[in-house]
Amino acid sequence: MITWNNLDTLESFKELSKVGRVDIKEAMSGDNGAKRVKEYNIPMAEGFTYNFAAKQVDADVLEALAKLAKEAQLTEKFEALYNGAVINTGENRLVLHQLTRGQLGDAVVADGVDKRKFYVEQQERIAEFANKVHSGEITNAAGEKFTTVVQIGIGGSDLGPRAMYLALENWAKKNNTFKMEAKFISNVDPDDAASVLASVDVAHSIFILVSKSGTTLETLTNESFVKDALKNAGLDASKHMIAVTSETSPLAKSDDYLAAFFMDDYIGGRYSSTSAVGGAVLSLAFGPEVFAQFLDGAAAEDKLSKNADIMENPEMLDALIGVYERNVLGYPSTAVLPYSQALSRFPAHLQQADMESNGKSVNRFGEPVDYVTGPVIFGEPGTNGQHSFYQLLHQGTDIVPLQFIGFKNNQLDTDVVIQDSTSQQKLCANVAAQIVAFACGKADDNKNKNFEGGRPSSIIIGDQVNPASLGALLAHFENKIMFQGFLWLSLIHISEPTRQEAI
């Protein structure tokens, strides 16, 4: 039987709070550090490795974290989620984004519909539509091919799909799968839509309107903006627009769209990149086969999240360490630092996914909690961040845990050798040096140049950003956030009660 208890009532959490603190500066110095780097590794899907050698953990802390995972029933709660339990009690909804990429457990039937079959059906419909666009079977009114796709949406309808598109754009060009350029309109500020429309040939553009409810203010406002632009160009908007929405929304059967593809209430916006929300734009931009590879990578990582052993479950361990840092060590924020320009918008997507999920102060029963919950998430790609906010990370008064992401190879296979090393080698050397510097510090008699060290970090290391690896990376963070929601608030971590309160 699953029980839902506040974090501070769990005996294992009380024990965790009493475990001795790890001096990461000492632990990462010399032979100790080399040993930790080899031992504190967990394999992930698609060739990734999660390395937590520079985190403030040791055997005692890890044992306490394992006890916390067991008492909090993290494995059982995840199993209940993917088997169709009502996890989102605030809105009385199932939580099924993992089901968009694979079947982890039992068949999930909701509203009389097998939901896995429903999601696959939408993916197949999108693939058929995208292939017809690419082949020229579906064209503009003049019989000419569409060359650009523009997604209109906000929040999870923008941040995730935009981040995924940017992550794969160069890979697709290098691997000859690039079909159409994608643009995104999100902000209700008219300059956003105006600038995008000025940058495209509207006669050869297809627009995707994304709104689950069909009533999202910003999205419908921008749709009107786009329709005016099409009308002013002498074009029939209904021949240039498709919708991604729910089957019950006013958009579902409208004649204003070439086609409508469906999502449902069981997919939270910030977890919708593997649903039709991401599927339509990514399939049009890169082809359905690329989107399928992306789903396969996410599904492979989801399977690892089922493991009850925290040393074989990178998402659960990452989540547990994050809770330890937030609730025992008292760190207020976390920086996500991908050393890949392809992931330039990935931190912004994770910022929404994490903070909108775990930025809550009441538990699933509506009761206030007496402890801190989700941290502030921020980040930028390296090495840009090194010349921006790393000053505070190294020498500021707050200790900020760091999540590095690094890759052995770039996407375009173009590089230059300067002083006996390539740019990619310099990039990798930078991230390695930063991990050591944050952990061990650098002594200097000039106090303005002195780095105390003792700043914890972890790194996810992969070979290259490609569709499958991107899917695995996305699933890692989605499932980490989920496990933390289970721990912090017995959480209604999928609900989104305050997004429109100021409107």
State what each model feature region is.
Residues 147-157, 162-165:
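Carboxylate/His-rich catalytic cores and anion/metal-binding grooves
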Residues 4-142, 486:
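Extended, charge-enriched "interface" segments that sit outside catalytic cores
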Residues 192, 197, 203-495, 499:
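A SIS-like phosphosugar-recognition module
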Residues 137-149, 260-262:
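Short, hydrophobic/aliphatic alpha-helical segments
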